[in-house]
Amino acid sequence: MTTSLPPQYEPTVTEAKWQTAWEESHAFKADPDRPGEPYCVVIPPPNVTGSLHMGHAFESSLIDTLVRYHRMRGDNTLWLPGTDHASIAVQTILERQLKAEGKTRDDLGREKFLERAWQWKAESGSTIVNQLRRLGVSVDWTRERFTMDEGLSQAVKTAFIKLYEEGLIYRGNYLVNWCPASQSAVSDLEVENQEVDGHLWYFRYPLTDGSGELVVATTRPETMLGDTGVAVNPHDERYAAMVGKTITLPLVNREIPIVADELVDPEFGTGCVKVTPAHDPNDFVMGQRHNLPFINLLNKDGSLNENGGDFAGQDRFEARKNVVQALEAQGFLVKIEPYRHSVPYGDRGKVPVEPLLSTQWFVKIESLAQNALACLDEDNSPNFVPERWGKVYRDWLVKLKDWCISRQLWWGHQIPAWYVISETNGAITDHTPFIVAYDEAEALAKAKAEYGPTVQLQQDPDVLDTWFSSGLWPFSTMGWPEQTDDLAKYYPTSTLVTGFDIIFFWVARMTMMAGHFTGQIPFKDVYIHGLVRDENGKKMSKSANNGIDPLLLINKYGTDALRYTLIREVAGAGQDISLQYDRQKDESESVEASRNFANKLWNAARFVMMNLDGQTPQQLGLAPGEDLELADRWILSRLNQVIQQTREQIEDYGLGEAAKGLYEFIWGDFCDWYIELAKPRLWNKEGGDVGTQRQLVARQVLAHTLDSIIKLLHPFMPHITEELWQTLHQAEGQFLALQAYPTVNQSLVDPALETQFALLIETLRTIRNLRAEAGIKPGAMVTVILQSENDQERQTLQLGETYIRDIGKVENLQVVSQLPPEQTQAIAGVVDTIQVLIPLSGLVDLDILRNKIQKTLDKVTKEYESIEKRLSNPGFVNKAPEEVIAGAKESLNAAAVQRQMLQERLKMLG
């Protein structure tokens, strides 16, 4: 094993090496018999059709950080991977392929179509999984699941049959979201409401008795052919006398009643609404309440059926135009107004969906939701992070309606119900009896027992909503309904990490299904992350065409850089993040900054390892307290504070804060200061036994601190830290990923010392800045006078004299309580109450320095006067926003301070 690092970090090579090594060695394979508290996460299964987008990268980075931390903490950890069969998405792809070949799925038939679907899955379905591998996710690939694999299919059948036998699944005729493009019912999640510019058409509906008319307004004129009533609000006095009368429906000449219903908004349109119970959710409710007929107008493809009369066979939008023209020709059109309103679109078919009366399978939700609510109210289970999402989840559970679970597709879990078609002359109707069973043999046996030996069966052609199998995901993936070792050890799972957009559709369904079948909520915590927004603050999405390909950034900057950026950008749990990206150059400043951080760590580690004389941290050990110098005790105290802080922040899901804290400690405290402070000891210029001992202690502290840093950072940047740890420890056959996470050594924590050392660092920083401002050559030795009336401050400065001399290139250091009188030809600065002076005689050309400072002073004075003039202008002060005025005052104060400092510098130069 090599004991040195290459001069440059090459992320592509390193990442591929460790991803392969981890997977081939089964480093992340879970064992339920292993000791340790269980920590389990099931992956939110991406669609098998998917490819990696920034949302996946963000979510996976968050999960992997948590999982790697808990594994290193000593927990018995399982991150279970898998993919979702994505019924509509796969079917859409396959039907698009068939269309290009001039075929339809009906031309192939169900069996051949499914063969083709499985073939497509085998050839193309692993894209998203392989891309997740590029992220370095520490999942147990031996447990990878697919929502249509044999075990999960058995779980789906079991769940369906149990719910049916308990009376919680039924077949009924209700309104569903119907997508004419896929010719299937779709879930609410698959519907996206879009604001569109449309029209509001006003039509006359004449009273049958000839005594007048009502004017109704609608955004969908074609549905008037299915009207079976007109409704008004019972408190609307304008129409009180008309309730109970009838109107004659134009074009159809159907007599329909006028009813009073609280659902009617008197302010919408004229306060009269047409009622089409088969094609509108509110109208459906009113139709049931007033016993109105339900007339279905639509075919599955969105064209009008025979109930459309003269418009039968026309597409719904073509029929809309023609119905309006016919009503206008007959004098029933009153007016047309522009109207912006919300239209539901199917997210796959990209066409408006229709509320359609259809016979479907439903799950009764009320009792399932009540159980989930009881867990939330009594035990705060699950615990939402951030807490506010618990209220959103609760509100949704209260408002739940029965869940339509059938889809008119072929790819998916076919509903385990067989119709006894011999009882209805070979046809499937609303009255055909059916048998629910695990397979056809069981169904046939049941049917023969009930209907005789000559029965004929036909399985329901529909498949289950994808969310039905996804709702079983946390426990079906572990072997349910069998009582497996995995289920006993890892269920309920520990944390679910997901976006807020599917709390309603996935999280709630999992809690309801799991609570019903296992008696336990499926996860202890639900960490809701925010959205990934683009450089303009807009949500990244396909429709907005503003997404960034994570693989492009991975190839350019490395996986660790992208992961670290995504996590570091999180201001707090649940907050959105914004990713800076130059689309013309394909560059990201924020990801580049993380790559620079990786390079900084690499270079620091390389320097440390080159100065350890080939020894590992174990071989070196850590010096006892009495041998530690001031800087050693400071960095070890800071290290242990950071260990405690990082552990607490990760435990509380403050991953962004943890990432930022590590960045500041590693780059600032360790790289910029401690390594620099340790260099003179490493180079052992003083020699002798004392010098050699000081060198050894510096090596020990450097090795210990670097080792701890690598471990602390591993969950966030796993690849570079694995490479560094392997080299530092000269390890063979071991992985950093399986080592213990650092724990706090309270005996090394010294807050008072940290405060002292912070003063030293600020003093050194000021000396460096003054040298640079004065133009003193880097190697030139200087005199520094440090003045403070505070005894404790002077004592601290004297304790740090060695560091001030070494880092500040100080030949003559004076720590005094009072400055000598008439200090001239010097440059000065201030640290708290400490005055810092560097005499300049013989070091720089004072005339050049005076001219430089005078130019800066002139510029600052001009800026000061400009701001002052603006603030004295009543027109600006009276009209400008408060924040603009406050900003101007702040700039004025800053300019005043800088001007005074420059004036004092000129005065001191003489």
Curated annotation (Swiss-Prot):
Gene Ontology biological-process entries: isoleucyl-tRNA aminoacylation; valyl-tRNA aminoacylation
Membrane recorded as keyword: no
Coarse class of the protein's main subcellular location: cytoplasm
Positions occupied by motif 'HIGH' region: 46-56
Gene3D superfamilies according to UniProt: HUPs, Isoleucyl-tRNA Synthetase, Domain 1, Valyl-tRNA synthetase, C-terminal domain, Valyl/Leucyl/Isoleucyl-tRNA synthetase, editing domain
Catalytic activity as recorded in UniProt: tRNA(Val) + L-valine + ATP = L-valyl-tRNA(Val) + AMP + diphosphate
'KMSKS' region (motif): residue ranges: 539-543
EC number: 6.1.1.9
Cell compartments where the protein resides: Cytoplasm
Disulfide topology: none
Coiled coil stretches, renumbered: 845-909
Sorted UniProt keywords: Aminoacyl-tRNA synthetase, ATP-binding, Coiled coil, Cytoplasm, Ligase, Nucleotide-binding, Protein biosynthesis
InterPro entries the record matches: aa-tRNA-synth_I_CS, aa-tRNA-synth_Ia, Anticodon_Ia_Val, M/V/L/I-tRNA-synth_anticd-bd, Rossmann-like_a/b/a_fold, tRNA-bd_arm, tRNAsynth_Ia_anticodon-bd, Val-tRNA_synth_C_sf
Gene Ontology terms: cellular component: cytosol
GO molecular function, one term: ATP binding
Residues holding ATP: 542
Written domain comment of the UniProt record: ValRS has two distinct active sites: one for aminoacylation and one for editing. The misactivated threonine is translocated from the active site to the editing site. The C-terminal coiled-coil domain is crucial for aminoacylation activity.
Protein function: Catalyzes the attachment of valine to tRNA(Val). As ValRS can inadvertently accommodate and process structurally similar amino acids such as threonine, to avoid such errors, it has a 'posttransfer' editing activity that hydrolyzes mischarged Thr-tRNA(Val) in a tRNA-dependent manner.
PANTHER family (UniProt xref): VALINE--TRNA LIGASE, CHLOROPLASTIC_MITOCHONDRIAL 2 (PTHR11946:SF93), VALYL-TRNA SYNTHETASES (PTHR11946)
Subunit structure: Monomer.
Family per similarity comment: Belongs to the class-I aminoacyl-tRNA synthetase family. ValS type 1 subfamily.
Protein's name in the database: Valine--tRNA ligase
Source species of the chain: Synechocystis sp. (strain ATCC 27184 / PCC 6803 / Kazusa)
Taxonomic lineage of the native organism: Bacteria, Bacillati, Cyanobacteriota, Cyanophyceae, Synechococcales
